Amino acid sequence: MDAVTPKKDIPRPDSVRRPSQQEAEEAVRTLIAWAGDDPAREGLIDTPKRVVNAYKEWFEGYGEDPVKYLSRTFEDVQGYDDIVMLRNIEVESHCEHHIAPFIGKAFIAYKPSTAVVGISKLARVVEIFAKRLQTQETMTAQICDAITESLAPMGTAVFIEAEHQCMSTRGVHHKHVTTITTQFTGVFKSDADLRNRFLNMCGQTV
């Protein structure tokens, strides 16, 4: 079967002016005061700096290009003709609506056309998109698009299951509810048996 024609461009965040460290810390002080506490008291005096440094780590995906990690491929696969799959990739992201964490697992697979990529690079792509303000639906599509664009495989499959703290710690306060999102291209979309095999390997009964 022919390889999937990759998309030309993967959506990336628009360019925005990045505030200085001082401006970001001042914004945190404002939120602390708005919450009803004194940002100048001993226990909170260094909190703005700590919060900004945590944001640097949580959202470092904005400074990374996922395609770069998928650019080095290997064509010597010794006749391998099946899917390549990574299971149980840790996902730690933040929803763009409340900046609340959502945490779960990603499962990704592709059926190579002519080349494969180092497996750690696939996990890195998941991490890059997770370390941005996200919706789970968008992140699922972005991961799938990045693999499809870079590797032009015969098909790509992405499955993510996560628990959203914007639902478990606020609002309706429903704990232990998970959200599942999937995206399929190529042979995973056209071949129900292959798609079901992937889902079974994700722990889903189909």
Curated annotation (Swiss-Prot):
Record region (Disordered): 1-23
EC number: 3.5.4.16
Pathway: Cofactor biosynthesis; 7,8-dihydroneopterin triphosphate biosynthesis; 7,8-dihydroneopterin triphosphate from GTP: step 1/1
Catalytic activity: GTP + H2O = 7,8-dihydroneopterin 3'-triphosphate + formate + H(+)
Entry-linked InterPro entries: GTP-CH-I_C/QueF, GTP-CH-I_N, GTP_CycHdrlase_I, GTP_CycHdrlase_I_CS, GTP_CycHdrlase_I_dom
Keywords: GTP-binding, Hydrolase, Metal-binding, Nucleotide-binding, One-carbon metabolism, Zinc
GO cellular component terms, A-Z: cytoplasm
A GO term for molecular function: GTP cyclohydrolase I activity
GO BP annotations, alphabetical order: one-carbon metabolic process; tetrahydrobiopterin biosynthetic process; tetrahydrofolate biosynthetic process
Superkingdom of origin organism: Bacteria
Binding site for Zn(2+): 95, 98, 166
Compositionally biased tracts (Basic and acidic residues): 1-17
Keyword Chloroplast: no
KW Zinc (keyword) present: yes
Subunit and partners: Toroid-shaped homodecamer, composed of two pentamers of five dimers.
Membership in a protein family: Belongs to the GTP cyclohydrolase I family.
NCBIfam families the record matches: folE, PRK09347.1-2, PRK09347.1-3
Protein name: GTP cyclohydrolase 1
Organism per entry: Hyphomonas neptunium (strain ATCC 15444)
Classification lineage: Bacteria, Pseudomonadati, Pseudomonadota, Alphaproteobacteria, Hyphomonadales
